[in-house]
């Protein structure tokens, strides 16, 4: 009988599962998720289930975060190759017999409908971090070329669907790993300089490049039109330019302190398109103004800085590269979303992390934060 009463309480048994968790990271995620719930309640006023579903998605993502945080980084490393191979295989399957919606072939029916490109947001940094860990201490230019090939294949398959937003996120995650692995600035500078020059040329020659009948190589027609609309939204104010114009109106009308919670006229009169998903930042800006935006941006900056600290303090090269790449995913998500809503980047369909509605994206974010927690936890357990 004594053995029965000597059993530790449920709290004591659960405590080790939370030991080593990174408090500042959890706090940043909690604040951003709370802001997401707040603005979802307002922007989804005519879809009562949207707020409930968003909360459910957060709970699912939180559970996934907790589970992944219990997996040691060395086990994550062992999963890198299988996850990458499965992800690329599913992308090939999508290209052959995927489901087409609105002109894009991005989904696959495997009993349930899935979007395999989401897997690559996690699989790509895992795979490249594994590759450079295996080559640690003997890196050669050829190793960076192999890493580039591992990156280009899935990015090319995703762009072919077409899905520019997801391909940008996967590309950013992969390039972050390659950069943190020690790629020479001599190789980084030329494409960056050429990219900047290219952007200036596009802006300078916009009237000629965006004239009727002109087609750009590489990009799909709708992608070209998005760039041209960004440069001059007034060319189609009720069509392709409507999103950008209404987003900028909402942001500007918020002023310094906003119109108040549930008082956004652009939002509640339904002028803002996709106000619970891609353009939720416009709804947030209208109701909470510049002050609210600065607080939200500060939350993302804190999250990103904390992720970089975890990366720098990680015990192994694999953990450092993975944490750095995951942190870059957060940065790319936030920068691209806020940029496109503000009219400084083309509309590419990238959600705002922890704020926008979307189950798949929320699960991906849960996986990403879980991996950061795993790396931070491993470091703390080693220190203790």
Locate the predicted segments by residue:
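A juxtamembrane structural motif centered on a specific transmembrane helix
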Residues: 1-12, 333-384
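N-terminal membrane topogenic signal
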Residues: 12-29
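Re-entrant/interfacial helical elements at transmembrane boundaries that shape
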Residues: 169-170, 246, 263-268, 299, ...
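Hydrophobic alpha-helical transmembrane segments of multi-pass inner membrane proteins, especially
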Residues: 26-243, 282-342, 367-371
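Long extracytoplasmic/lumenal interhelical loops at the membrane interface
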Residues: 248-291, 311, 318
């Amino acid at each position: 009988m004594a053995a029965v009463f000597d059993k530790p309480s449920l709290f004591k048994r659960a405590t080790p599962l939370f030991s080593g968790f990174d408090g500042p990271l959890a706090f940043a995620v909690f604040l951003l998720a709370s802001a997401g719930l707040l603005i979802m309640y307002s922007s989804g006023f005519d879809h009562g289930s949207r707020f409930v579903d968003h909360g459910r998605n957060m709970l699912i993502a939180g559970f996934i975060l907790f589970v992944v945080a219990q997996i040691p980084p060395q086990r994550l490393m062992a999963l890198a190759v299988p996850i990458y191979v499965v992800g690329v295989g599913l992308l090939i399957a999508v290209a052959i017999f995927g489901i087409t919606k609105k002109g894009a072939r991005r989904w696959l029916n495997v009993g349930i409908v899935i979007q395999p490109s989401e897997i690559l947001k996690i699989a790509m940094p895992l795979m490249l971090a594994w590759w450079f860990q295996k080559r640690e201490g003997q890196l050669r230019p050829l190793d960076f070329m192999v890493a580039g090939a591992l990156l280009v294949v899935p990015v090319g398959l995703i762009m072919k669907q077409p899905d520019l937003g997801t391909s940008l996120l996967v590309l950013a995650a992969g390039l972050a790993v390659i950069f943190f692995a020690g790629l020479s600035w001599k190789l980084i500078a030329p494409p960056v300089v050429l990219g900047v020059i290219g952007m200036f040329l596009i802006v300078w020659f916009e009237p000629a490049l965006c004239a009727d009948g002109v087609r750009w190589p590489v990009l799909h027609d709708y992608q070209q039109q998005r760039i041209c609309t960004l440069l001059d939204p007034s060319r189609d104010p009720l069509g392709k330019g409507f999103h950008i114009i209404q987003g900028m109106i909402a942001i500007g009308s918020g002023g310094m302190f906003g119109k108040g919670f549930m008082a956004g006229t652009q939002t509640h009169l339904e002028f803002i398109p996709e106000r619970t998903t891609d353009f939720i930042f416009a709804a947030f800006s209208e109701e909470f103004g510049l002050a609210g935006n600065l607080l939200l941006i500060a939350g993302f900056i804190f999250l990103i800085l904390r992720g970089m600290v975890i990366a720098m303090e990680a015990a192994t090269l694999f953990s450092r590269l993975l944490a750095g790449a995951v942190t870059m995913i957060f940065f790319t998500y936030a920068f691209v979303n806020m940029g496109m809503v503000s009219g400084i980047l083309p509309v590419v369909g990238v959600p705002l992390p922890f704020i926008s509605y979307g189950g798949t994206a929320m699960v991906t974010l849960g996986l990403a934060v879980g991996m950061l927690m795993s790396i931070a936890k491993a470091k703390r357990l080693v220190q203790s």
